[in-house]
Amino acid sequence: MQLTALLALATLAIAAPAEPSEVAPRNVLTGPCSSGVTNSNPQCCGAGILGILYFDCETPDEVSSPINPLKTICAAEGLQAKCCTLGIAGLGVLCTDALPE
């Protein structure tokens, strides 16, 4: 019993970091879309159904920036700026409005 307790204590002492590590701040946004798993693909899309499926989606040819936001790039083509989870064959799946830059 004492050996088990001693081994558990030794394991915890070895596993504990010597110094507290610093977490560097990171930007969670990469352009008009979040950097998560969902809604991370910038798309210019046409009409949509219930915010789940959008038609006529295409990846913009230009890189968006604060000077030239995705909304402006898509509006020039008559489309809406969206952030989609998946873009396949002109369809945008699980899309939300793009964030302002």
UniProtKB/Swiss-Prot annotation:
Pfam families: Hydrophobin_2. One of its GO terms (cellular component) is extracellular region. Transmembrane segments: none annotated. It is found in: Secreted; Secreted, Cell wall. SUPFAM superfamilies: Hydrophobin II, HfbII. Keywords: Cell wall, Disulfide bond, Secreted, Signal. Its main location: secreted. Residues 1-15 form the signal peptide. Disulfide bonds join 33-83, 44-74, 45-57, 84-95. Induction: Expression is highly up-regulated in the presence of root and stem powder of Shanxin poplar, but also under carbon or nitrogen starvation. Belongs to the cerato-ulmin hydrophobin family. Homodimer. Homodimers further self-assemble to form highly ordered films at water-air interfaces through intermolecular interactions. Aerial growth, conidiation, and dispersal of filamentous fungi in the environment rely upon a capability of their secreting small amphipathic proteins called hydrophobins (HPBs) with low sequence identity. Class I can self-assemble into an outermost layer of rodlet bundles on aerial cell surfaces, conferring cellular hydrophobicity that supports fungal growth, development and dispersal; whereas Class II form highly ordered films at water-air interfaces through intermolecular interactions but contribute nothing to the rodlet structure. This is Class II hydrophobin 5. The gene is HFB2-5.
